[in-house]
Amino acid sequence: MTTNEKALMMHEKWQGKIETTAKSHVNSREDLAIAYTPGVAEPCKVIAKDKEAAYTYTIKSNTVAVVSDGSAVLGLGNIGALAAMPVMEGKAVLFKEFGGVNAVPICLDTQDTEEIIKTVVNIAPAFGGINLEDISAPRCFEIEERLKELLDIPVFHDDQHGTAIVVLAGIINAMKVTGKNKEDSKVVVNGAGSAGVAITKLLLTYGFKHITMCDINGIIGKDSQNLNWMQQKMVEVTNLEGKAGTLADALKGADIFVGVSAPNIVTQEMVASMNQDAILFAMANPVPEIMPDLAKAAGAKVVGTGRSDFPNQVNNVVAFPGIFKGALEGRATQITEEMKLATAKAIASLVSDDELNENNILPEAFDPRVADVVSRAVKELI
């Protein structure tokens, strides 16, 4: 039985991967009177006077909404709200299993930016945080920014920032292995959607100076056509040398490649044209931009992918559960750039110098230390 066949069989068996479990058991009239009427009126009255009391008396303190419109689901594309449910349920499972955070999947049957924003604002009182998921670019940028302005709870688009944080963590350790540094390293980010933009922004914040972004048409620069508003903003802070040409042109003399794009678009010749001991994060799924063995044979020193069957898996699950765990425990109102940097450094620190090598630059998703270390890094900045 293949993995896909087993997944379908198990989803049919589960009929949903999460369920509601009661903390308060109702086994008597007294239990009923305390959990519901008349006793439930007391916490209601307290919250009515002080909305912060909701963190003490309700699930708000440890619950996030996983919100999607189904417009950019995995490699499946715009499959809509209902078809996105298995992914959002899975995300809720990961929140609970890896971070101890309760999560509710909410798939919205609209792809209108204003309707999504209004809906999330209206449901926000029930939650301590909002995790945006699988919303297409460039709409995802506006939706997140507007919600951050409107709400007093953390709003986090994991496709952007979770990916960026883990990529930075991996690069921090890969530079230790290769002896490269952020000031001199030339970085190429291929893919200018939500993940590519967020990765580039975080690398710039960390201190990288030489970053070139590419899309399906090649190098992105001031003369590029058909850029969306966010890509136009990125032109102002990337490709400062004014390069033009193809991805192959961009990779000549580069030190680091980050791919969030399409399968098999990087050749061995391209890798060979990069600087010595190149770092490649080829994260297209399920087939990366170049297979690790081919990249290594062409001269790459460190290669990461999004897959669990290769070394150096770049997996968001080492980031988002701990980030929200820390944000909720610390009652953060937002997740800042400083928190993202601290999280990346914390994740990188989990691989000791003795353990660090070209095939081991990131902690395993099942490392029990991860969520607590990440949550502490977040809470220290609240």
What are these regions (language model features)?
Residues 12, 55-60, 96-97, 122-124, ...:
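Solvent-exposed alpha-helices and their adjacent loops that cap or buttress functional pockets
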Residues 105, 131-134, 155-158, 189, ...:
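General beta-strand structural signal in soluble alpha/beta enzymes
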Residues 1-153, 375, 381:
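N-terminal ligand-binding/catalytic initiation module
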Residues 69-71, 79, 108-109, 134-137, ...:
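Short, ordered loop/turn segments at secondary-structure junctions
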Residues 158, 282-382:
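Adenosine-phosphate binding glycine-rich loop
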Residues 232-302, 307-309:
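Rossmann-like adenosine-cofactor binding region
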Residues 74, 81-99, 157, 165-262:
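Glycine-rich phosphate/diphosphate-binding loop of Rossmann-like nucleotide-binding domains
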